[in-house]
Structure formats: structure tokens, C-alpha cells
Amino acid sequence: MKNYPVKKNDVIEVEIIDLTHEGLGVAKVDHYPLFIENALPGEKLEIKVLKTGKSFGYGKVLTVLKSSEQRVPVKDENFTKVGISPLQHLAYGAQLSFKTQQVENVMQRVAKLQEVPVLPTIGMNDPWHYRNKAQIPVRKIDNQLQTGFFRKNSHDLIPMEHFYIQDPEIDAAIVKIRDIMRKYSVKPYNESDNTGNLRHIVVRRGYHTGEMMVVLITRTPKLFPISKIVPDILEAIPEVVSIVQNVNPKRTNVIFGDETILLHGSEKITDTIFDLKFEISARSFYQVNPQQTEVMYQKVKEYAALTGNEIVVDAYCGIGTIGLTLAQDAKQVYGIEVIEEAVKDAENNAKLNNIENATFTAGLAEELLPKLVENGLQPDVVVVDPPRKGLDGQLVNTLIETQPERIVYVSCNPATLARDIALLTEGGYEAKEIQPVDNFPQTTHIESVTLLTKAVD
């Protein structure tokens, strides 16, 4: 038996001194950290110890003895249960400060770069109702088809109709589709024995166009009575221009399967970023917060500082949103993306906007960029927008060897950003400025844009 200062089921009084990067309150008992959900710095709480481990433990709030001035009423207790909005109890201004501090902390701790300016996080005027996409699981509860979200760390569905961080038109559409499925006794998916059929309802909506896409994700290709379901959806939701069925027969947590069937209308919806049109398919990666995407891309344009003469490489280009945004001010843009379907979308989006100075190639940036250089291309600006795992080590080496004048790094993970900045700094680059942008209010996710330039000897 380990001799910790607290043990499971102890009821103790603590004071919260900090927040973790996941938004949990931190208290210490004889230097032993306890992490507590729904707790804010400065609060005095009575808690119950839930679990103890070698380095830290977890607790649960029983009573708030002294509340933080930054605490605000929560929108919905179910939000806490499912973990969708772990910061909903923290005033929005304090959320922004928390995110700025997280970036500063990781830059100092991981990159050992205290002097890099981290600007205040750019927030939203209304930090709710921002998501343009919903992926809602479907299950049977009390013998009825239900939509909602899974309880944290479980596959128990909690029925929900209002998600608050999603476009309210999407919330309303989900409820209407749910009711249509109930009307026709569609069988919801049963994960335990891999029976039933309807697994998820996915809805995408163009922020500027209002166009809506409905994706019905099923276990089998047969969805009865589809001849009645489709007209009912169109009648209930006039904004729908695309209805798609996606078939996923596997026992997996992955939402989409490989087979997609068009049931009505177009395979894509259209939305705009600045004055550019983009076509979005069921599986396209497209930024989920359209308002903040424009804020973030404006910062990318500022850091790229294009004059019309530059060669730009857009690594991890997706469907071309960043590259095509920059093409208007560049000599030539080369987009690189590992997913072939996204490359085709990027090419189509270039045609849609009559942009002729952008080309897109399928492959790994760490393999294709050296080939471009071998063929005589010298990029002036490289934009990288990697997944959470950050840059591939080989790509970091390639960037250092290629020596573009500027690197603009769009990050969704401060820890891997700091790691990569440290490596690029060793390779002769200097991080000039980091601008966090709050694309995900009420959550702990942090996006940022960083400018790196060649260091001056």
C-alpha cells in the first residue's frame, strides 16, 4: 500500500491553485497534486478523493466553499457529463487568458524559448453556436431511437437536443431527422452485438451559404424506407441540398466507412472563405469554426507577407483553403496533401475560383518538397498546417535544408508546436511571434499561427 497523503474516498478541504491543460483544477496536499473537474483557481472546495496514483490523484467537488469571480453558470449539466465543453463554467475572458498562458507555458517548458512573444488569444464576440458540423451518435434508450452524446470515457449515450456550441440550425435539423427516423421505426445501431443500422447522423452547414448536407451513417447499405425518409427530410429541412448515406459495417470507433451513396442532390455543399468558394463533401476536412477561420487565415496572410513575386508551398494543404487564399497574392502556390480525395477537391476548388497559379499534388510533404527543390524550385514561404502530432521529423529537416525565407506554422497542438519550433530554431530559424486564435470556445483546444524567419547572424 502506497503511503500517499490522501486515500480514495477521503473527504477533504482544498484550495485550487491552477488549471491543467485539460482544464482540471489543481490542488496540492503536502505537495501531492489532485486534479478536480469543474474547479477554478482561487476556489476553496470540499472534495472527495476518487483515485490516487504514483504522481497525482483525482477528486470530485462536493461543496463549493468559496467561489471564483470567474465562475459563470453552465449552459447545461449534460455538457459536463459528456465533456463537450470543459471550460463552460469559466468566464470567456478568462478562457482566453488561460489559452494564452498555456501557449506561453509550453514554449518555456518544451522549447525553452522564454523570449518568443505570445500575443493575447483572439476570441469571438459570441463564443457559442460556432460549429458548422455535427457528428451525432444514434442509439436505443428506453426502447426508443435517441440522439445525443456519449458520457465521458464511455459509450453510454446521454440524450441531448441542444449542443450550444453548434449552429442552432444544425441542432434543429438533428432533432427533425431523429423524429423522421422514429416515424419509420429505423433501427438504431447496437454496439454490443453489432446489430441495428443507423449509427450516426452527420450534418454540415455552410455558414455563408446556408446550404445543408445530411449524412446518414449506417451499418448496412439497406436503409428502409429510404424512398419515404428522403422526401420527409427535404420537406422538414428546406435548406438541405445534399443527402448522403455512408456505410460502415465495422465494429469500430471510426465514424465513417469507405462506401458513400448519394441519395439526393449534390455530393457537396458550398461555403466561402473571404471571397473564395469551397466545395465540401461528406468527408472533407474543413475548419469547423468559419468565423475564426477567416481571423486565422488573415493572420496567415499577414505573416506570409506576399508581394506577388513569391513561390509558396502549402504543406498539409487539405482541400486548398489556405493555399488558394494565398494564391491571389503569390506568384505560384504548390499544395501538398497525403489524402488523394482532398487533392482532387483542392483542384476543383481552384477551378471553381478561376485560380490558375496553384497546383496540388498527392503525397507526403517530407518526400515531395525535396523533389520540388531538386527540380529547381526555391520556395520563399512554406505554410504548414499539420495534425495534432505536429511535423514529421523528416519534414523539419527538409525545411531546414530548403531554407525558405519564412515559415508560417498553423498549429492545433501547442506541445508539438513547441517541439517543432525548438527543432527549427536549432536549424537556423527564429520564432518571431505566436498568435493564438480561439477556434473552439468552451473547450481546451488551442489553435495558433506562428511566424518563423531565418535567423540573422
Swiss-Prot record:
The catalytic site is made up of 412 (nucleophile)
Q: Sorted alphabetically, which InterPro entries does this protein's record hold? A: MeTrfase_TrmA_AS, MeTrfase_TrmA_CS, NA-bd_OB-fold, SAM-dependent_MTases_sf, TRAM_dom, U5_MeTrfase_fam
Residues involved in S-adenosyl-L-methionine binding: 287, 316, 337, 385
Gene Ontology annotations of biological process type: rRNA base methylation
PROSITE patterns named among the record's database cross-references: SAM_MT_RNA_M5U, TRAM, TRMA_1, TRMA_2
| Keyword Isomerase among UniProt keywords | no
Q: What is this protein called?
A: Uncharacterized RNA methyltransferase EF_0728
| Statement: the UniProt record of this protein carries the keyword S-adenosyl-L-methionine | yes
**What keywords would UniProt list here?**
Methyltransferase, S-adenosyl-L-methionine, Transferase
Question: CDD domains attached here?
Answer: AdoMet_MTases (cd02440)
What the entry lists under SUPFAM superfamilies is as follows: Nucleic acid-binding proteins, S-adenosyl-L-methionine-dependent methyltransferases
The Swiss-Prot or TrEMBL record describes its family as follows: Belongs to the class I-like SAM-binding methyltransferase superfamily. RNA M5U methyltransferase family.
Q: Name one GO molecular function term.
A: rRNA (uridine-C5-)-methyltransferase activity
Task: State its Enzyme Commission number(s).
Answer: 2.1.1.-
Record-annotated TRAM domain positions: 5-63
The domain of life is Bacteria
